[in-house]
From Swiss-Prot:
GO terms for cellular component: extracellular region. Disulfide bonds join 27-33. This is Gaegurin-3. It holds the Pfam family Antimicrobial_2. It comes from the Eukaryota. Belongs to the frog skin active peptide (FSAP) family. Brevinin subfamily. Monomer. Has a non-hemolytic activity. Has a broad spectrum of activity against both Gram-positive and Gram-negative bacteria, fungi and protozoa. It is found in: Secreted. Keywords: Amphibian defense peptide, Antibiotic, Antimicrobial, Disulfide bond, Secreted. InterPro entries: Antimicrobial_frog_2 (IPR012521).
Length: 33
């Protein structure tokens, strides 16, 4: 149903956000920004 779609979208968004935060953090640590 709709709830499972919403959950999937939220999961994907969370994954993307985590990926973005990780890459930002690692580039700051490596000073490659």
């Amino acid at each position: 149903g709709i709830m499972s779609i919403v959950k999937d979208v939220a999961k994907t968004a969370a994954k993307e956000a985590a990926k973005g935060a990780l890459s930002t953090l690692s580039c700051k640590l490596a000073k490659t920004c």
